[in-house]
Amino acid sequence: MIKKIISFAICAFIFCLAACENEPPSIRNPIYNIVSYEDGSYLGNKGGIFLSVHFILYDENGREDIGDISLINTDYGYCWNLKNEDLEITKWGDEVYYGYSFFEYDNAESVLLGNYIIRVCDKVGNIVDSGFLVEVENYSKSIYKFDFPEYEISVKDNRKEIEIKKMKYLSCEVKFPRNLAYFKNSRKKFENEERIILSDKGLEPNTLISFRINAEPDGKLIYFLKNFRVQNEIK
């Protein structure tokens, strides 16, 4: 009996020692975007609105030590759960961010605003929380509904230039999904009131263009327009 007690005590001591040596992960600088996708845009035929959340995550034992991740709206008590392998990795500046771009609520018809917590649990049970506020400028309701703004796209100057009409925006980012040579398969940003000149020779008819619209000064509100074919010119 005494031997069993001693063995149990030793095992408990070893477990506690291991747990003490495993420092909890840390979360900092959570950032979010509210992203709306028009039917026929980046997501294909399905439109909708999603909350995108990314953050700097550090664990001294590496990413493999991270267990479950939760995003919690504390005002509504609504929770999304992710596994380690669900995390996206994005580099902004000199920092590496982890997160997820498609937190969905109400069948992608709306986004919950208000107070949020990111909760990360490592594999020995350490838990860390980080809070942040999701809001839309000049919008007072607690639920932000999907409502895609009206706009028109026209082609100018023999298919060299694109113009987006009616929609107000801070900047526009352009990508050619099926022409990888353009902009090295990345998006080129055009600031508000800057002419969107895409080619000095004129784009080929039927060229497909993807538009990302940054609508707010803080970049929190983003729209992906329906992919546009150059042949669909509006006079």
Where do the protein language model's features map onto the residues?
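Proline/serine/threonine-rich low-complexity linkers at boundaries of modular beta-sandwich domains
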Residues: E21-I34, V128-K145
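Contiguous beta-strand segments within globular domains
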Residues: E38-Y58, E150-Y169
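Solvent-exposed loop/turn segments flanking beta-strands in beta-repeat/beta-sandwich domains
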Residues: E60-T74, I162-A181
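Aromatic sugar-binding surface patches on proteins
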Residues: D86-Y105, K188-S199
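Surface-exposed, short loops/turns at beta-strand junctions within beta-sandwich domains
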Residues: Y105-L113, S199-L208
